[in-house]
Curated annotation (Swiss-Prot):
Record bears the keyword Cytoplasm: yes
GO cellular component assignments: cytosol
Localization, UniProt: Cytoplasm
First-listed, main subcellular location of the protein, grouped into a coarse class: cytoplasm
Lineage: Bacteria, Pseudomonadati, Pseudomonadota, Gammaproteobacteria, Cardiobacteriales
Protein name according to UniProt: Ribosome-binding factor A
PROSITE patterns: RBFA
Role, per record: One of several proteins that assist in the late maturation steps of the functional core of the 30S ribosomal subunit. Associates with free 30S ribosomal subunits (but not with 30S subunits that are part of 70S ribosomes or polysomes). Required for efficient processing of 16S rRNA. May interact with the 5'-terminal helix region of 16S rRNA.
GO molecular function, one term: ribosomal small subunit binding
Amino acid sequence: MAHGVDRTRRIGEQMRRDLAQALVDIVHHPHASLLSFTAVHLTRDLSFAKVYVTHVLDNEEERSELVAELNAKAGQFRHYLAKNLSIRKVPELQFYYDQSVEYGARMEQLLTHLVKDSEHKD
């Protein structure tokens, strides 16, 4: 059981690295070079992959546009992966914006604010 999980994680990490390399050739968006693939979560049977990305853009509309372009070019990414991965069937890809970095920054900001408030009360 654990062996299957390790294999899935290992393949996901390899996919993440390969997708980053393919990005420059496939996506011709002006801000594509500022994009990072943060994680790939695969189903146990390797038929489907959720690919999480982050971007330094603050503009929600541009981020949505970029993720939509990634999803539109999922077939090209799959073709690239098929040439580079040693697996029988390349999973279907779905791209999502990873909000965890922003969420973490917001939590840190709130905690800092709480600490400052408690220092002022003392």
